[in-house]
Regions:
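C-terminal accessory/tail domains of diverse enzymes
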Residues: 1-102, 115-181
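Short, conserved phosphate-binding/catalytic loop or strand-edge motifs used
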Residues: 104-108, 112
Length: 181
């Protein structure tokens, strides 16, 4: 498996700027068109369709309670690949230049395409994360409140079930993890 062929998406939470300001910051890097696609009373979504037809979304995030609702934004990238890393870095820099900030409530979520992996690979990944999780959480300075609410650690029970059943397929892992396929 070539790691450079894996696709991913990322969600980045930011505060101190409106979703419109964040959308225009993204546009300054990716080009294309910016449009307001929602109503302010919901997630107030904005979209930036880049020059390649991919859509970057900027939505509200109710978990960022330390700032007024209009200054909470979550950037949702399109599906990206290895070659998009430099552009993603430029998007983050543009958001920072526009005044977007992070605070202790902000987080990121990285979604990795599971297609190249089977149940054995993903089970092993879960076990590696589980073993290194205390170090990762300490290095990132994750607050106890966030751990209790949003960033839940991998459970002992899940790892025990993975070790007991040793899944070979994603369907088997889904049944272990979620209790169904």
């Amino acid at each position: 498996m070539n790691l450079k062929e894996i696709h991913y998406g990322i969600e980045i939470e930011t505060v101190k700027r409106t979703r419109e300001q964040i959308a225009w910051a993204i546009h300054s890097v990716v080009g294309g068109t910016v449009r307001h696609v929602g109503i302010p009373s919901s997630y107030d979504p904005w979209e930036v369709e880049d020059l390649r037809g991919r859509v970057w979304k900027v939505v509200g995030d109710a978990s960022l309670t330390s700032v007024p609702a209009h200054l909470r934004a979550e950037v949702v990238s399109p599906v990206l690949g290895y070659d998009d890393i430099p552009q993603l870095q430029e998007v983050v820099r543009a958001i920072r230049r526009a005044g977007g900030k992070i605070n202790s409530q902000c987080g990121i979520h990285i979604h990795i395409d599971a297609a190249p992996f089977d149940g054995r690979h993903l089970g092993n990944l879960a076990k590696i994360i589980y073993k290194q999780e205390p170090l990762i959480l300490h290095a990132l300075g994750i607050s106890r409140d966030r751990l209790n609410r949003y960033t839940r650690p991998v459970s002992d029970e899940l790892i025990q079930r993975i070790e007991q059943h040793r899944p070979r397929t994603k369907d088997q892992l889904n049944r272990i993890w979620y209790g169904y396929h």
